[in-house]
Amino acid sequence: PSGPGGVAIPRAGLKKYVLPPDYSGIVFPERTKLKFMDKVPAVPKVRREPRQLRDIRGPSREATDFTQGQYGILALGGGYLHWGHFEMIRLTIGRNMDPKTMFAIWRVPAPYKPVTRKSLGHRMGGGKGPIDHYVTAVKSGRLVVEVGGRCEFGEVKPFLTQVARKLPFPAIPISRDGLQQMRQEEEEKRLNNQNPWTFERVVTANMLGMRKYLSPYDLHLKGRYWGKFFLKHRV
């Protein structure tokens, strides 16, 4: 406001600045960028395997928690990663991250599972076809890659979102705190559920004889997973 004669009166204001985050406990690995993954496993002779779709069925039991990084990409469904997906992840993150202040590590192994395919126009029969390529099986709830360092989630979220959209299964960028909050919300939803007719109760009581239509996986996973798909609306 102006004083007498239109002269501005100087006033001292009190400003409160937000304290910067503390990065003192972060340990950087020797190599800050993602390492190159081999297209073919280094084994003398690979045996041709059945499909074994159980590799991508249900929840993951490994790589479900953060180890070094603060941010990462979380799979919300099952699927197979080809070597091209590994290169896409490595190149996209490598171009966008600052290796002096950030680091990234893999949470999935290199392609190890052989996938066979017969040549185009080949007739039926004649045994199993030759190995065409190798893939890595990923289950729902597994971390694909971790990113950490002296950075905030807003800095890494754009390129992590770009990577997550190109993966062959539903995935989201997430932080360490966000993962913990997501699990707390799922637990609260389960404890505060007002609907008495849950999937677990209906199946346990064998209502309308539905057991004969369900598999042992449905009983074990309580209907939250349908093959490789994660049904997040189920309680």
Q: Over which residues does each language-model region extend?
A:
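Ribosome-associated RNA-binding proteins
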Residues: P1-V235
